[in-house]
Design a protein with these regions (language model features):
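Terminal targeting/low-complexity segments that flank the catalytic cores of oxidoreductases
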Residues: 1-69, 152-164
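Residue-level signal for functionally critical sites in structured catalytic/ligand-binding pockets
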Residues: 44, 48-62, 66, 83-87, ...
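Active-site-proximal alpha-helical scaffolds that flank and shape metal-associated catalytic sites
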Residues: 75-150, 158-161
Length: 174
């Protein structure tokens, strides 16, 4: 069962989070259509933002409170952002985005980064809910992509060397 099916969408926070998710999904679907590799580049660009925002915000919270104790949470959030960065690197090798798409990635990072920072600082619950919806949409999008690969409609290429290096039993920092 998907996240969207489990959540009460009656309150304004959930409704806003869901509407933003649908807006971003519509925008990605319209712009990229069935170019799943290129869509994944932008999705992974955006996916790295929440972990970085949360990690940095917790870091500042620790500094403001002048207390230790946030270290593990900070490391987990930043590790999640790093993991998403690596996913982006894999899809860049697969999709080979052109200069326009690279500019789009930069724009998406700036716009979504500022938007998510605002949401996280002032409406934390809604920000978390929105990311839950994003993850659900990512599962749908990647499932569609996988089905196309398995059906032969999209070429199944070898994993990039960077991917193999990163996922090896003793990964090195690429």
């Amino acid at each position: 069962m998907q996240i969207l099916d489990k959540i009460n969408k009656e309150n304004i926070s959930d409704a806003f989070a869901l509407s933003m998710t649908k807006f971003f999904r519509f925008t990605a679907d319209t712009f990229f259509a069935k170019r799943y590799g290129h869509r994944a580049v932008v999705l992974e660009t955006v996916a790295g933002v929440p972990g970085m925002v949360a990690g940095v915000w917790m870091h500042f919270k620790s500094l403001r409170a002048m207390k230790a104790g946030y270290g593990e949470q900070i490391r987990e959030m930043l590790a999640e952002a790093e993991n998403e960065r690596m996913h982006l690197m894999f899809f860049i090798e697969i999709a080979k985005p052109n200069i326009f798409e690279r500019l789009l990635v930069t724009s998406a990072q700036i716009v979504f980064g500022l938007f998510y920072l605002f949401m996280y600082v002032f409406f934390t619950r809604t920000a978390h809910r929105m990311i839950g919806y994003f993850e659900d949409e990512a599962v749908k999008s990647y499932t569609e992509y996988l089905e196309l690969v398995e059906s032969g409609k999209v070429t199944n290429i070898d994993a990039p060397d960077l991917c193999l290096l990163y996922t090896s039993p003793s990964p090195r920092d690429p």
